[in-house]
């Protein structure tokens, strides 16, 4: 049994939608990123990579590599999870916290859980996604960007 923690943040800019947890959320702006800017899936990738001692998402999908420009983060997550399985582990459970003043995440949480569960080949009951605000404090509170944290438990197969 191993645990991993991940964190990601992206700044608003350009046109929407915002992609979070593999789900497109209508919003007046998108997130500035080399890939699709999905902070939730990036945090999950980092948590999984951390759990197997394999560094971070930037090491595996560097933003200096044109191959990953505009990449679908669901593809990245599936690739990372294949590395987890190659090391002899499977997901136990996952807990994700999205920190954003806007857009509102609640209507999209179930779809996020479903998408993530599919990509991680697990029962939806093993995936929890929640959202909170920072009570209008800091960059997320000023609607300048979105942050996300993820914690995973993986077990030997």
Curated annotation (Swiss-Prot):
Species for this entry: Photobacterium profundum (strain SS9)
Amino acids binding 4-CDP-2-C-methyl-D-erythritol 2-phosphate: 8-10, 34-35, 56-58, 61-65, 100-106, 132-135, 139, 142
Keyword Metal-binding in annotation: yes
Gene Ontology molecular function: 2-C-methyl-D-erythritol 2,4-cyclodiphosphate synthase activity; metal ion binding
Pfam family, one: YgbB
Keywords recorded for this protein, A-Z: Isoprene biosynthesis, Lyase, Metal-binding
EC class: lyase
Protein's name according to its UniProt entry: 2-C-methyl-D-erythritol 2,4-cyclodiphosphate synthase
Functional pathway: Isoprenoid biosynthesis; isopentenyl diphosphate biosynthesis via DXP pathway; isopentenyl diphosphate from 1-deoxy-D-xylulose 5-phosphate: step 4/6
């Amino acid at each position: 049994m191993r645990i991993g923690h991940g964190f990601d943040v992206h700044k608003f800019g350009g046109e929407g939608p915002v992609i979070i947890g593999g789900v497109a959320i209508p919003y007046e702006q998108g997130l500035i990123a080399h890939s699709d800017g999905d902070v939730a899936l990036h945090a999950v990738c980092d948590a999984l990579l951390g759990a197997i001692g394999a560094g971070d998402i930037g090491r595996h999908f560097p933003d200096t590599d044109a191959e990953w420009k505009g990449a679908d983060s669901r593809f990245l997550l599936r690739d990372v999870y294949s590395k987890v399985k190659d090391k002899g582990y499977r997901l136990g459970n996952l807990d994700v916290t999205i920190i954003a003043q806007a857009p509102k995440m609640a209507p999209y949480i179930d779809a996020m859980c479903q998408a993530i569960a599919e990509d991680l080949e697990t029962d939806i009951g093993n995936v929890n996604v929640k959202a909170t605000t920072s009570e209008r404090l800091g960059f997320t509170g000023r609607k300048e960007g979105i942050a996300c944290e993820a914690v995973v438990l993986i077990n030997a197969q």
